[in-house]
Amino acid sequence: MRYTSAALESLIDEFAKLPGVGRKTAQRLAMYILREPRAEAERLAEALLEAKDNVIRCSVCQNITDVGVDPCALCTSKARDRSVICVVESPVDMLAFEKTGHYKGLYHVLHGVISPLDGIGPDDIKVRELLLRFTMPQSPAVREVVLALNPTIEGETTALYLSKLLKPLGIHVTKIARGIPVGAELEFIDEATLSRAMEGRTVV
């Protein structure tokens, strides 16, 4: 069923483009917006535009940060262990590990994984930026890279590729322990399981 209002249909169509949002959920979101005062809709629109205008990727770790805060707060923090870098697929995965409160090192966000079937190769994710962290002058002395990628075929392929690049540089390469279900996404794994996976990481 489609509504007689073209403006409402357009709003529903835009909501339906969001990840994990089907048409029914999009309809509920659209109806919620219509019920709320105009000021609420304006605040939502302003927040969306502000995020698009002011959120950037950290030039070092590729995590999200604000304009004017680059490198990001994690990269510049003196409280972090600069000898360890945890490589994750997305900023959401990084946040999942931060919520455990267990890991105290640095991060690198790939923004994807190698997936030949989808036409995604090493040049399409932040591999080059990762390697630069070990080859640039005055780079911190990193002794370990933890590969914390989702336990999927693509994640395993990416982990294998990265280990082959990093080992010749004399870097100790590990990956989080098994115990996370195959095919699961790290953002949905509970904090205790993620902590155990980090503690029990194994050599690649």
From Swiss-Prot:
Top-level taxon of the source organism: Bacteria
Name of the protein this chain belongs to: Recombination protein RecR
Entry keyword annotation includes DNA damage: yes
NCBIfam families in the record: recR (TIGR00615)
Entry-linked Gene3D superfamilies: 3.40.1360.10, 6.10.250.240, RecR Domain 1
Gene Ontology molecular function, alphabetical: DNA binding; zinc ion binding
Family the entry assigns: Belongs to the RecR family.
Any one Gene Ontology BP term: DNA recombination
PANTHER family for the chain: RECOMBINATION PROTEIN RECR
High-level lineage: Bacteria, Pseudomonadati, Chlorobiota, Chlorobiia, Chlorobiales
Pfam annotation, one family: RecR_HhH
